[in-house]
């Protein structure tokens, strides 16, 4: 029977519960335990698949094709474990399931209520992870903040879990924030006291309180939190802001959290195997040089919209002992602004996306990289932008486009597959893990060092095979495809240092100690392209003609 660790948050949102949950998973795995992690999201959406990145950040795709919360990306990167759709539960999923059961008559005509029906469904989904993954321990993050009305059923469900599973099999960890008052030079504990008080009013007594802080905190603060929170002093963990998120497991271990969790759950503590992790963090904090990589997208104001891409670039930089500095380039900006940003970068990444807004800037970036020999990595939509730009400016296909952008284009170089036509959004995309057969001798094959790989997808539109021969004749070749030859998965330029576009999302599979080979190869070329500080002359490229359009 598995044991459970529940992580809640108080005082403010975005306090760091996701990183804390991932770090706890790392600490327990380093002690030889089989670990599973999951996120309970209180919002009413079924999943974040159709939510705006401005609202939610990136959508993280699991191996089995679930569109999930970005925190699952942290979980996978920290624990190096592939999660499943069962690892992300939303209020929308829970209510949909309960209502469907009521319609089928599963409740035998009874009155359907939040307690017990909604809470029972939540508990069943938590236990489903235990059945699927057979872990020793499940670490569960409860989204939102204590006091949010939509989170109440989830808190009630985890309260009941301790009663049903036994006190020694359930641990509650509460993550709070200690605000700093500059005028008095004090760190205040009162918000944490009230947050714990509210949690206790629900019936949950936290076993551990983790206090996030941006300023040094003394032992007197720890003692005060322990007194008002009714926990042991060594169960109050002071967690200052880290230089890198990957340092958090080491900070929590030094604070004694790993030992405390093991002892509370009735296990003998073991020495954690964190040597590789410590070396990785040390290298992250002391790189030999810096690279500037342009990330060209339309949601750059919210960096979380491209979280996995940024982390994958940093992982690849670690493999080459360089620090990757992201140059955020808004693809909706004026051409002159985009050009100015691209003058002094070592490489360009155009990440995934949807819709027509900002495509002009993305294609300008693709053309600049192609014409100037600058390393380019196009991810999903980034491949589409490179294909359209090449079709127009090299193949001479006037008006070439994607039918996603222009349904009436005379040259649909990017198009829906026939079986996708007429299907509405929401659960209709090509999602999850699919095989890709690599062409021997290509840059992609050399990067992977394998002939068959599996990658995660999230898209509806594909490269149109009707134009494949024309592209290959001009040097833009297919270097990876589905084993049946139906789908183009990777394209690359023959006569270019590194110009590769992929239909999938390799960033979802990158880990700090196991960076993705495509990102490693990209950074490996980029670090030889441009000396630090050097600038290229303007103009960079002629503008790409695109019709004005909005999302």
UniProtKB/Swiss-Prot annotation:
Pfam families: CTP_synth_N, GATase. ATP binds at residues 14-19, 71. CDD domains: CTPS_N, GATase1_CTP_Synthase. It comes from Thermomicrobium roseum (strain ATCC 27502 / DSM 5159 / P-2). It is an enzyme of class 6 (ligase). Keywords: ATP-binding, Glutamine amidotransferase, Ligase, Magnesium, Metal-binding, Nucleotide-binding, Pyrimidine biosynthesis. Residues 292-532 form the Glutamine amidotransferase type-1 domain. The keyword Ligase applies. Allosterically activated by GTP, when glutamine is the substrate; GTP has no effect on the reaction when ammonia is the substrate. The allosteric effector GTP functions by stabilizing the protein conformation that binds the tetrahedral intermediate(s) formed during glutamine hydrolysis. Inhibited by the product CTP, via allosteric rather than competitive inhibition. Catalyzes the ATP-dependent amination of UTP to CTP with either L-glutamine or ammonia as the source of nitrogen. Regulates intracellular CTP levels through interactions with the four ribonucleotide triphosphates. Pathway: Pyrimidine metabolism; CTP biosynthesis via de novo pathway; CTP from UDP: step 2/2. It catalyses: UTP + L-glutamine + ATP + H2O = CTP + L-glutamate + ADP + phosphate + 2 H(+); L-glutamine + H2O = L-glutamate + NH4(+); UTP + NH4(+) + ATP = CTP + ADP + phosphate + 2 H(+). It comes from the Bacteria. One of its GO terms (cellular component) is cytosol. L-glutamine binds at residues 54, 353, 381-384, 404, 460. The active site is at residues 380, 505, 507. Homotetramer. UTP binds at residues 13, 188-193, 224. Belongs to the CTP synthase family. Its EC number is 6.3.4.2. This is CTP synthase. CTPSs have evolved a hybrid strategy for distinguishing between UTP and CTP. The overlapping regions of the product feedback inhibitory and substrate sites recognize a common feature in both compounds, the triphosphate moiety. To differentiate isosteric substrate and product pyrimidine rings, an additional pocket far from the expected kinase/ligase catalytic site, specifically recognizes the cytosine and ribose portions of the product inhibitor. CTP binds at residues 13, 148-150, 188-193, 224.
